Regions:
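Conserved beta-strand hairpin/beta-sheet module of binuclear metal-dependent hydrolase folds
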Residues: 2-57
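Active-site metal-binding motif and surrounding structural segment of the metallo-beta-lactamase
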Residues: 41-95
Length: 95
């Protein structure tokens, strides 16, 4: 969904949340929550790998609270992404 200058992507996360905001003009991306690990593996990871190929990055990652349906996908992303100086999936600005 695009609203003016913002693209909003809501990944399927069952009872959790996994939302990516892309401010198009500024080319700034915010990931809010990561859903369950299955959300990350099935939807978020493939999307991040695709946009990373074109040089995109996550400028900010926000975890709203530590319930597993909000944080487990983020935990898996951070585990798999590795060192921030040499990310395996996507560059992340701030968490």
């Amino acid at each position: 969904m695009k609203i003016a200058n913002v693209e909003i992507i809501m990944f399927p996360a069952k009872s959790g949340d996994c939302i990516l905001l892309h401010f198009i003009k500024e080319n700034f991306r915010i990931l809010i929550d990561g859903g369950y690990v299955s959300t990350y593996e099935e939807y978020l990871k493939p999307y991040l790998m695709k946009i990373s190929e074109s040089g995109a990055k996550l400028d900010l990652v926000i975890v709203t609270h530590i319930d597993r349906d909000h944080i487990n996908g983020i935990k898996k992303l951070l585990e798999e992404n590795g060192n921030s100086k040499c990310p395996k999936i996507i560059e992340i600005g701030e968490v």
